[in-house]
Design a protein with these regions (language model features):
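Low-complexity, Ser/Thr/Pro/Gly-rich disordered linker/stalk regions
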Residues: 1-222, 226-300
Length: 300
């Protein structure tokens, strides 16, 4: 890979880091920066695979926000449709969207080659009349050993030491959190539950991390950026960091995200739905969300 180059500062919340080796963005207004390539919002260009069932992610022109964004508004976005009564993709009425995103070939190759630290980011906007119900999932980073990295969610217990999944969630009233699936050990549990303003274990499911550290707002563009730093084998020095609109809201240090050198950052689990998996989580009406300006960089 190329040598590090100065990147965006926090003034551009898609890239809240000081330098990177290699990166991409689908943001059409991103400035020309060495080693940052612009790619279309397209399945082939972004290495999209394992699309969930019949769920679509059509590229559309999103509606205008209820107030201007501090950045140029995206002209193209994936549209997620949450049908009335929909919740988990495994239920009778599926909703949202779901797939895995590896990024362009050069970035995917760098990740599979053993990159230790990366950031993935996107902008999202919820319907202006959004109803939260009990909560739902939003895209986040994932990784692990080979195909064991997939489906590191849904209450999975087997081979949990060989994967991690760091999707986000919204909760009642728009409270945000990282819904963390990590190797099952006391070190990770202690770190994740200590992130302010508070955490919660969810039986065999993920750990709610930093619930209420920020609030989503319907009808406006929100920029999400997530950083994963893998731990050295045998050390508890992994990190997960999250920025919302350029502000760091969660920074978990001292994690064990892997126990084997072959466990890698894979990209993004680009999934969103209402749930939970029971009807009390379901969307009360047809609702929509839009996802745009998908980006990713390898730091080292």
């Amino acid at each position: 890979m190329s040598q590090s180059t100065q990147a965006h500062s926090v003034s551009d919340p898609l890239f809240p880091i000081q330098s990177f080796k290699l990166g991409f963005t689908t943001c059409h207004t991103a400035p020309a920066i060495p080693h940052l390539s612009t790619v279309p919002l397209d399945d082939a260009a972004l290495g999209i695979h394992k699309n969930t069932g019949k769920l679509k992610h059509d590229v559309v022109r999103p509606p205008p926000p209820i107030r201007p964004a501090p950045h140029p508004e995206p002209e193209r976005a994936w549209e997620a449709r949450y049908f009335q009564g929909s919740c988990s993709p495994k239920t009778e009425i599926p909703g949202g969207l779901g797939f895995y995103l590896a990024g362009p070939k050069d970035l995917a190759k760098a990740l599979e080659g053993g990159a230790k630290e990366a950031v993935f980011s996107y902008r999202m906007m919820l319907d202006k009349d959004w109803e939260w119900v009990k909560g739902g999932k939003l895209p986040g980073m994932y990784g692990g050993i080979g195909d064991l990295a997939y489906r590191c969610s849904g209450g999975r217990l087997y081979e949990r030491c060989k994967c991690f999944n760091l999707r986000l969630m919204w909760r009642p009233g728009g409270q945000g959190e990282v819904y963390a699936y990590t190797p099952l050990n006391d070190t990770n549990k202690k770190v994740l539950l200590a992130i302010p303003p508070g955490g919660q274990t969810n039986s065999d499911y993920g750990i709610s991390t930093g619930r209420g550290a920020w609030n989503f707002e319907p009808g406006v563009w929100t920029t999400v950026a997530e950083r994963v730093k893998l731990n050295e084998i045998g050390e508890a020095n992994g990190e997960v960091q999250l920025w919302i609109n350029g502000a760091c809201v969660i920074h978990a240090r001292g994690l064990i995200l892997r126990e084997d050198e072959t466990s890698h950052i894979k990209g993004m689990h680009f999934q969103t739905f209402f749930g939970g998996h029971t009807s009390d989580w379901a969307s009360p009406k047809d609702q929509y969300a839009w996802f745009a300006d998908v980006s990713g960089v390898v730091i080292r």
